[in-house]
């Protein structure tokens, strides 16, 4: 039962925040003002790095350095999950000194590689190939999320990776994903007209 602070309204709780009774806090943060560097982290998901907020950072190089610092501060008992599909993040991965990170995405040779995506009208299904240790390569079949769009599959994969690192069983993870109905105003279906969804 974690405390949750999110940037958008979570459909299941009709709010963007919830005070939990557990030890964990799940926070959606961004790099807009540099305050994400002050967050105490154990696990993080780094989804993408774009040329944004340059009014604050002054240059893209300065922005990249802030992401580098954020990932480097991952403690030895935690992990940063980095999306290897993002070209700007790839350049950071190459220069990391820390070993406390794992990669995920559609890209080949990631630690958590998305495979066999099946896109349906109201949900997406996919398989996940895990490469954690050379002798430990296996595939989790038929993961379903009640969301559409490759970005939602990628985001779900980052969450799955953290849950697995925390020792949560895959069946429990799949059950939780089946219950998740998304965030308001993020690829939200508003209405249907004929065979088209808007």
Regions found by a protein language model. Give the residues of each.
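Short beta-strand segments
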Residues: 5-6, 28, 47, 83
């Amino acid at each position: 039962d974690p405390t949750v602070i999110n940037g958008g309204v979570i459909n299941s709780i009709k709010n963007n925040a919830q005070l939990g009774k557990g030890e964990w806090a799940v926070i959606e943060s961004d790099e807009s003002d540099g305050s994400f560097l002050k967050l105490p982290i154990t696990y993080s998901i780094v989804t993408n790095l774009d040329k944004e907020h340059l009014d604050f950072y002054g240059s893209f190089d300065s922005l990249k350095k802030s992401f580098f610092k954020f990932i480097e501060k991952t403690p030895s008992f935690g992990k940063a999950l980095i999306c290897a599909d993002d070209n700007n993040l790839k350049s950071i991965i190459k220069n990391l000194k820390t070993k406390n990170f794992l990669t995920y995405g559609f890209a080949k040779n990631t630690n958590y590689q998305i495979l066999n995506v099946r896109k349906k009208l109201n949900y997406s299904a996919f398989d996940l190939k895990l490469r954690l240790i050379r002798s430990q390569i296996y595939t989790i079949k038929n993961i379903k999320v009640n969301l559409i769009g490759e970005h939602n599959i990628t985001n779900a994969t980052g969450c799955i990776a953290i849950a697995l690192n925390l020792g949560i069983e895959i069946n429990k993870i799949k059950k939780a994903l089946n219950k998740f109905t998304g965030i308001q105003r993020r690829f939200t279906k508003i209405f249907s007209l004929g065979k088209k969804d808007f």
